[in-house]
Amino acid sequence: VDELEQEAIRYNPENRCYLCKHYLFGKLLEFARDHGVTQVLDGTNEDDLHVYRPGRKALREYGVISPLAACHVTKTEVKALAAKYGVSVAHRPSTPCMATRLPYGAEINYDVLDRIADGEAWLHTMFGAEENLRLRVHGDMVRLEIAPERMGEVLEKREEMIAYLKKLGFSYLTMDLEGFRSGSMDEKITQKEETK
C-alpha cells in the first residue's frame, strides 16, 4: 500500500491522519476479509486517547478494536511489558508517522521523508538511539527539536551537524528553543479546537 498515491493524503491536509488511517485500514480490512479474519486490532494505548489523534475516527468507523486503550494501558506500561518479555524494540523512542515532520499543506514526497529519516538516524548516532528528537522541515529549513538539557551539546557539535544536514539538502538549520514536543506540528490545530 502506498499512501502517497492518494492525492488527498500527499498534499497533507489537517485531516491527513484520518485520511491515511481510513485508507490503510480499509485495505487491511479488505485483506482480513479475504483471509477469513473477522476482527482487526490496533496498538492505540491510553495515552493516545488524551492527545490529538484524528486517525482514531477512522478506526471507530471501521470497528477496529484498541485493546490497550480499552484496558487503560499507557505507553510507559507498554514499554515495560515489552522489556519484561524481551521484545527487541522495548527501549526504542516512539516513532510517529514521518509526515508529522512537515507542516500541514506541504506536499509529502519520498525524497523529503528519506532525507528526514536519514538526518534523524544520524542524529541518533550522536545523541543516543533512545533520545527523543525530531527534524521538522519547513521548505528548505530544518528545525531540530531536542530536550533542552541537550541543547548545549547540540551547539558543541554544530559544525558536524551543519555539514551533515546541509549534505542532505537542507539550506537553513535551526534549533527549536522550546525543545522536543511530541505533536508540535499540531499545536495550532489543538489551539483552534480549544477555542471552539
PLM ranges: what are they?
Residues 12, 16, 110-114, 149, ...:
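Alpha-helix N-cap and loop-to-helix initiation/capping positions
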Residues 52-57, 107, 191-196:
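Short, electropositive alpha-helical surface patch
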Residues 121-196:
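Peripheral terminal appendages
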